[in-house]
Amino acid sequence: MLNSLKGLLSRKNDVPSPTVISLGQVWVDIMMDIDAIPQPGGFAVANHTMPSVGGSFRVMQAASRIGAATKHAGVIGNGPWASLIRKALNDNGIEHIGQDRIDADSGFRLVLNDSERKTFVATYGAESQGNENTFDCVEPGEGDVVHISANTLMDHSASGIDAFLHRTASDPTTRDYSIVLNPTNTLHMVSDHLLEDLVLVQPIWSCNR
């Protein structure tokens, strides 16, 4: 993913200040190191617990670190997890241009790590509560890079992605900005209609799995 961004930004040197705009979701990961996953009804003690901001934040952090102006267009909530996310964005020079929800906190994931594999338990929050107007604030300029993660394609925010594509990117031959799609391992859960629309706009596929 980072190599894709570096390549795109380096090819846009003739365009002033290209911006990376992420339409992905951001949540908090709570990593818990355990000796073994407990059986149903069992008990386990975490040796180490560390909360960190995850989701599309890592892509934006990488873009910011290589010197690109970086913006987050996803939804952020109101609460302790959202506060952690906002601080991480501010600390890394990432501007939040998306919607704010005051009636829900951002979500989090419990990540149980037994040294052999990771087990995930997700609680979805404000980041997943978008609609067809979620990304109306996004107006990519010439040379910009728009990042889309598959997580945003599987819930209410998916309608916002589809609306954004139809509004700004329907003809890839005339589009003056780039789209990078990170499908992760959940693309099979995306609706056929939205997947077809994504294929038609001819994004750059970042296949890192």
Predicted regions and their residues:
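Ribokinase/PfkB-type carbohydrate-kinase core domain
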Residues: 1-26, 86-101, 114-209
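Glycine-rich phosphate/adenosyl-contacting loop at the front of the ribokinase-like
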Residues: 2-75, 80-87, 143
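Glycine-centered flexibility motif
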Residues: 41, 77, 107, 125-126
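Beta-strand->loop->alpha-helix junctions that form or flank phosphate-binding loops
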Residues: 48, 73-78, 95-106
